[in-house]
């Protein structure tokens, strides 16, 4: 925010001038104290940007954000926390949308850009978190692993066709694979945060099928299980390619039978969300169509019954 913005002129400079002028008229000897007080208050307001959170995302221009924390989740998965310019700032990302990360990668002819969905929300001011799995051929994911605390990352957004609004449908079924859980988690947390018991009005039912290869690949399982335990209208069904002994979830690939058993049946007030590796998404598009859901488009739109991130 500019120091000479109308908000600062009307909210800082004019009130400060009136306070000093009024003090001068009433009691001149108190003027230095009035000046000192207004300087402190004005400085605090200018530094924090006022009490209203400031949205920092720019959809047309990349901005650089400083890496402040790295938390290893596994040998190839990490949560990267980037600081926003001010403690009260928020990213300004609508629920369901994502951001673009850009970097100049050695050996690439031009700047590489990839999309990611933060696992944090605008309820958490001053930073945003990205859960990223590093792939051997992943340009941006590998680049992120080289960042040190204090380094910066170029970010632009928001982008995407999905903008979740409370009660946009009666029942949402989700199928996620690997790091495809990130947009699902964003929506799940938003729905539960806005439940009637929490002072909101969202009564949307949520069912999630979360597929992975090994037990250790189930990202954010503790957080997901906690959310499901707290919310009777949110259910999870885990699927593993290599299940451990005594496993009670699904085994192998997600099948039409699993979808039929664990997700809502096709209806006008039902939406199915898909996010995961391309081969999985291709298979899930065919599976949902075979079960009577509307055929997924190559590029999803908000109104689609089957939406692919």
From Swiss-Prot:
GO terms for molecular function: cytochrome-b5 reductase activity, acting on NAD(P)H; NADH dehydrogenase activity; transferase activity. Keywords: FAD, Flavoprotein, Membrane, Mitochondrion, Mitochondrion outer membrane, NAD, Oxidoreductase, Transferase, Transmembrane, Transmembrane helix. PROSITE patterns: FAD_FR (PS51384). FAD binds at residues 145-160, 171-208. It comes from Neosartorya fischeri (strain ATCC 1020 / DSM 3700 / CBS 544.65 / FGSC A1164 / JCM 1740 / NRRL 181 / WB 181). The lineage of its organism: Eukaryota, Fungi, Dikarya, Ascomycota, Pezizomycotina. Belongs to the flavoprotein pyridine nucleotide cytochrome reductase family. Gene3D superfamilies: Nucleotide-binding domain of ferredoxin-NADP reductase (FNR) module, Translation factors. This is NADH-cytochrome b5 reductase 1.
